[in-house]
Amino acid sequence: MAKESMKAREVKRAKLVAKYAEKRAALKKIVNSGDPAEAFEAAQKLQAIPKNANPIRLHNRCKLTGRPKGYIRQFGISRIQFREMASNGLIPGVKKASW
């Protein structure tokens, strides 16, 4: 189990990313446009946005345990929880492979 503070930090980052998404996109467009003076000013504003508002800093975590590695996107849980839940029949439509 991940620490509660790590889970909370990830939730906080997700909120920041959502809050600043439009502003970041607009500033990035200006920076990449061409006019050097305008681009410089936009870059300064972009640097003033919090670091955690950058979507690159988001990391997928298991919804049940908070585990950051072995995450299965389709189900939103870690491989360990997926295996356990699938074995117990808790995930509809998932069964053990046999060939």
Curated annotation (Swiss-Prot):
Coiled-coil spans in chain: none
Keywords: Ribonucleoprotein, Ribosomal protein, RNA-binding, rRNA-binding
Cellular component GO terms held in the UniProt record: cytoplasm; small ribosomal subunit
GO molecular function: rRNA binding; structural constituent of ribosome
SUPFAM superfamilies: Glucocorticoid receptor-like (DNA-binding domain)
Annotated GO biological process: translation
Record family assignment: Belongs to the universal ribosomal protein uS14 family.
Official protein name in the record: Small ribosomal subunit protein uS14
Organism listed in the record: Phocaeicola vulgatus (strain ATCC 8482 / DSM 1447 / JCM 5826 / CCUG 4940 / NBRC 14291 / NCTC 11154)
